[in-house]
Curated annotation (Swiss-Prot):
SUPFAM superfamilies: HPr-like (SSF55594). It comes from the Bacteria. The lineage of its organism: Bacteria, Bacillati, Bacillota, Bacilli, Bacillales. CDD domains: PTS-HPr_like. This is Phosphocarrier protein HPr. It comes from Halalkalibacterium halodurans (strain ATCC BAA-125 / DSM 18197 / FERM 7344 / JCM 9153 / C-125) (Bacillus halodurans). PANTHER family: PHOSPHOCARRIER PROTEIN HPR (PTHR33705), PHOSPHOCARRIER PROTEIN NPR (PTHR33705:SF2). The gene is ptsH.
Length: 87
């Protein structure tokens, strides 16, 4: 399992557009990928799950990936987050 914690820097947090960016990127990998925030974990491939967390700017989130391409998945998701989540 690979995991990493990130601070969300996008002004509006993870709303519809950033959530779509994350879900689309996660969908490119076969690994199980979860997003954890405030003790709740959701499937990062589920737009409804990601949106339900209500992640705002400055929030600390943990991404966990488990599977054959977990390292690549975590790296790809990290790039999306560092690029500002499409904002």
């Amino acid at each position: 399992m690979a995991e990493k914690t990130f601070t969300i820097t996008a002004e509006t947090g993870i709303h519809a557009r950033p959530a779509t960016q994350l879900v689309n990127k996660a969908g490119q990998y076969s690994s199980e990928i979860t997003l954890e925030y405030k003790g709740k974990a959701v499937n990062l491939k589920s737009i409804m799950g990601v949106m339900s967390l209500g992640v705002g700017k400055g929030a600390q989130v943990t991404i966990k990936a488990e599977g054959s391409d977990e390292a690549e998945a975590l790296k790809g998701i990290e790039e999306v987050i560092k690029e500002g989540l499409g904002e």
